[in-house]
């Protein structure tokens, strides 16, 4: 596949699949494909779960309703086991994070050439379909969690309590305030950074492996046959990866917010 319709080199093929559709320049560059797919999948999640909730009955539930109930019960039990405060927002937030990130990750299951090829026919030169392979998306999600951590830390502990937590832990002595502040600030800032980079790194690496396997199809018969086996094996393994990454992001969010609700 090529934006010019000519044969691509392996390097240009990889680069093409890793390039976003953008508008703007410099700091104000917008990755349109990441925004469209992330917002679109978020709206699809809301519509599907709203529909399941609206059609819920006391009788025998349908297959989709059973599936939704299993997910909701799984997330709810995870919140009850991990979150030690009282906040009705946490369970819906955890459900949204888990399902939304899973749906964005699941886009990696679509063969790498399908949607970009269709976009090329429509005159769109680049199209990245997996939003979580865009570090801007993963950092946006992590930043949202970070804002909630700060908000609930101040709401539960008060401004003075939050400042005291930063300055008198882990060493409870006024002389250690600079050291405590440095350690606690690094720990606090590391939370969203680790959330974002873990999700981005795993999904970006997974997408790159799919692209490398796809290159084998154009080599020769032997490599093409090997590519089929490798793609099937990686596809099965990657289902575990995308689910696990959504679960880890959700669980760490619950843990961080539970820590924010702890009043020392």
From Swiss-Prot:
Primary location: membrane
SUPFAM superfamilies tied to this protein: F1F0 ATP synthase subunit A (SSF81336)
Membrane topology: Multi-pass membrane protein
Organism: Shewanella frigidimarina (strain NCIMB 400)
Protein name in UniProt: ATP synthase subunit a
An example molecular function term from Gene Ontology annotations: proton-transporting ATP synthase activity, rotational mechanism
Regions that span the bilayer: 30-50, 90-110, 111-131, 134-154, 177-197, 208-228, 235-255
Top-level taxonomy: Bacteria, Pseudomonadati, Pseudomonadota, Gammaproteobacteria, Alteromonadales
CDD domains: ATP-synt_Fo_a_6
One of the protein's GO biological processes: proton motive force-driven plasma membrane ATP synthesis
PROSITE patterns, per the entry: ATPASE_A
Stated role: Key component of the proton channel; it plays a direct role in the translocation of protons across the membrane.
A GO term from the CC aspect: proton-transporting ATP synthase complex
Key words, A-Z: ATP synthesis, Cell inner membrane, Cell membrane, CF(0), Hydrogen ion transport, Ion transport, Membrane, Transmembrane, Transmembrane helix, Transport
HAMAP family recorded: ATP_synth_a_bact
Family of this protein: Belongs to the ATPase A chain family.
Subcellular location: Cell inner membrane
InterPro entries in the record: ATP_syn_F0_a_bact/chloroplast (IPR045082), ATP_synth_F0_asu (IPR000568), ATP_synth_F0_asu_AS (IPR023011), F0_ATP_A_sf (IPR035908)
Pfam families: ATP-synt_A
Subunit: F-type ATPases have 2 components, CF(1) - the catalytic core - and CF(0) - the membrane proton channel. CF(1) has five subunits: alpha(3), beta(3), gamma(1), delta(1), epsilon(1). CF(0) has three main subunits: a(1), b(2) and c(9-12). The alpha and beta chains form an alternating ring which encloses part of the gamma chain. CF(1) is attached to CF(0) by a central stalk formed by the gamma and epsilon chains, while a peripheral stalk is formed by the delta and b chains.
